[in-house]
Amino acid sequence: MIFSVIIPCYNCVKTLERTVESIRVCGLSDYEILLIDDGSNDGTAELCDRLCGKNEEIRCVHQSNKGVSAARNRGIDEARGEYIWFVDSDDTVDEDSLRGVLETALLKKPDMLLFGMSFDYYNHGKMYLRENLNPPSEGMLSLQNLKDDFDEFYNCNALTPVWNKLFRIDLLKKHGTRFREDMFLMEDYLFVLELLPFCKEIYSLRKPIYRYRQAEDERSAYRRLQRIENLAEYMQPFEQGLKTLGIPCEHVENLYSMLLKQRMYYASFSEIRSLVAQHNRGKYCRLKQPHPLKIYLCSRLVRIRHKLAVAVKSSSFFASSRARGFSSVS
């Protein structure tokens, strides 16, 4: 068997079947789909069983609710293929879109294969924007090649997720690379960082294959950030992973600054004051922050502008779709 597709499933009864069907027609052959039900309580578990019963290439595993990282790790343990691909339960791929990926994997046999993706933005259930992101280069890369162009790969989001990559399972198991189950933000990126030092050959495809559905609930990432008591301490595994790769410390600082900014985006004024005070006592205190009041006011202004931009883009997109004879885009 060549491919094991791992789909962690938690309360996704409305989207899972569409995701599974898109994989079944994406052009893969000699593959399995592993549905890891992570203690769902909305009918997802029963849907997993039905899909498994109807399709011989689908297997289903049930476990108590432990989180997406534990579900992915269970998938690694259960997988039978040469390559593993992690897919989220509300995302899709286009028909026949992975045929070229299949051919490349069979011919080149890289340790890791990465490809492009699109971010699909929705408003009231309808897509109003698709943003394609592709790796900066095409072809086989050595680890040193990737390190030399690390910023370019990072800035186009080619490195941070796992769902735009195929991984050799024997490499994961040989080096014991797992998802950190005590982390709930950017655990994908840490997984990639910890595996990269063992990848001798990496193949890059400049084609947007994976369709990532951006959550309409913009506060979901913020709620996960709220669970981090000390952001500087949370950064330590990323710092170690980047240090092992030989990536300059400025990258860690930029990552920290980005997460701190996101953490303060929806925060109250008192929360921002507390976060800035904690920052000023911490490891990254040399990265100067504006006055808490300025942060608070700027965040509110940006949120207002964002809501207006979404409303304008949505109405323009829907009007254009109607003019072309379509009521919506999915």
Kindly label every feature range from the protein language model:
Residues K14-E17, D42-R50, T92, D96:
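Acidic helix N-cap motif at the loop->helix transition within catalytic regions
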Residues Q63-A79:
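Glycine-rich, basic loop-to-helix element that forms the pyrophosphate-binding segment
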Residues V68, S89-I202, Y210-Q226:
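Donor-binding/catalytic cores of nucleotide-activated saccharide
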Residues I84:
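Short aromatic/hydrophobic "clamp" motif used to bind/position activated sugar donors
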Residues Q240, S268-S330:
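Membrane-interface aromatic/basic loop that binds lipid-linked glycans or pyrophosphate carriers
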Residues K207-E216, A221-E253, Q262-Y284:
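Catalytic core of nucleotide-sugar-dependent glycosyltransferases
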Residues E21-D30:
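Short, acidic, metal-binding catalytic loop of nucleotide-sugar glycosyltransferases
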Residues S22, D37-E46, S64:
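A conserved acidic beta->alpha catalytic loop
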